[in-house]
Amino acid sequence: MKKNEAFTLIELVICIGIILLLLSIGGLNFKIRDRVQAREQVKELALDLKFLKNYSQINNIRTSMKLSDEGYSINFGHNTKTVKFNSLVNLESTNLEKITFSNKGKPSYLEEKSSAGTINFSVVNKKYKITIQPVTGKVNFIEIKE
């Protein structure tokens, strides 16, 4: 009689369980990575605003940023940078669509609209606020604790 070599049912169930466990850990890492990436994008927006302010002061030219629900684009000198938001980044409210800094680094008034104001974001269940102060143009990034 020939003896057949094969896996037992218990061995197969254990192997499938281990594989499923490893796959679920990988799925959790992707969710965490997306949250971190979304938060970093909001921080990058605040840093880009600070960069625009400083660039306009140093080079004595106007700089601007256009903000939308999908992302933003900045114009400085002859250069343009466009950033598309992560799907987790949600622009909740803002009184700014276009932000312009004068050649002295101050928020300018174009078409009777101020470039100073507040931008509110949410990433999953966390909220962030970016403020631009009216006279000085100082940019603040605040994580709102609930």
Language-model features: where?
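A generic structural signal for short
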Residues: 7, 40-41
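N-terminal single-pass transmembrane signal-anchor helix
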Residues: 1-30
